Structure formats: structure tokens, C-alpha cells
């Protein structure tokens, strides 16, 4: 199992969902399971279509996405980063939420998010179009997702490891490099693949998530080295 019934995906088959979580003073308390034949892309599309008003909070997104669990919420939060359009402030809020949710996955606990993050308002004018474009990409992935390479998605040890990998992606997503090409896209793809892979028991997709995490780390290391080398060159120029 991905985790015990108190937290997430009940079993490996497509279509099992979590009922809407109950909240008390900003804390997610408990969930119940039901059955749904909706695909992941259909769930995302329906949720996006339900967004109304000029702003939306993460709390409202969590209530809407509750039907298929918090791993799907992690996937949802990556959608704005799958296209080369930066929305100021979103990577910090969404990255922090992903880190806390992945911590809950690692510890096999219901996720708790601070009120400050839950109630942070996000403008829907830019968010909704990017979510729609991201959901279109997920619908293409949906055709190829299936249970395979089970050793990457089964067992308590792999659950914790995969939770840590999603957390690492959230940390990389929060790096203040939004204006640099691919700095949000690469970790976003990693988190998306990991989340969908765990939900659907697709070890190949999980392995793809590992690959993009490594690629992100290497990319950031190259950027860091380039910045350091440029700084050294400038210092030598002014000293000489």
C-alpha cells in the first residue's frame, strides 16, 4: 500500500478516491474512502473548472482535490510550472505545501499545513490558464500510466523514500530562481511523475521522477558554478 488507510491511496487500482477532508481550525483531520471511475486528468479538469472568483486559497484547492487524495494535490501544485510562464510567489507557497505533504507521506500521517499557507490568496487570472495547460499535459500522461516495476512503489521503506524524494523536489522548487529557464519546470516534472507514479503504482514513472530530480540537482549545480566563476572573474577584473 502507498500508506495506511488513514492517509492516502487505498490500493493500487485506478479510481479509488478519498472523500473530502474535514477541517477544524485549518487542520486536515480525517478522510473517508469511496469509489470513483474518474481518471486523474478528469479529476484535475473538473477541479479547475470549479474555480470561481478573482482569487483562490490553497485551503480551497485542498477541499476540491480531496476526491483522489493529497498525492494528487502535489501533482496539481506542479501544473503551473510545466509551462515557461512564471507566476510570482507561487513557487514558494506551492513548494512549502508540497514539502509538508511529502513529510506526512514519509511519516505516514495526515498532512498539516500552517494557516498562513492555507489561506494565502492566489490570483486566478494567471493561475487558471496555466493549470489548464498543465492538465492537458497530464491527460497525455494518463494514457501511459499503468502498474509496473512494483518494487519502486511498494513497502514502507519505498513509501518513505519516495516521500523524501517529493520533499527534495519541493525544496528545489522553492529556490528563488524563477526567472531562470527550467528552474521551476524540472523539479515540477519530478514531483508530478513521482506523485502520479505512486498513486497508480507505476514504478517507471517514479523512476522518471528520480531522473528529473537528479537532472535538477545537476542543473542547479552548473548554475551555481557558473555564478561562482563569474564572480571570481569580476573580482579579478576589478582587482587587476
Curated annotation (Swiss-Prot):
It is found in: Cell membrane. Disulfide bonds: none annotated. Keywords: Cell membrane, Membrane, Nodulation, Transmembrane, Transmembrane helix. Its main location: membrane. The keyword Transmembrane helix applies. It is a multi-pass membrane protein. InterPro entries: ExoD. Coiled coil: none annotated. GO terms for cellular component: plasma membrane. To Synechocystis PCC 6803 slr1875. This is Protein ExoD. It comes from Rhizobium meliloti (strain 1021) (Ensifer meliloti). The lineage of its organism: Bacteria, Pseudomonadati, Pseudomonadota, Alphaproteobacteria, Hyphomicrobiales. The gene is exoD.
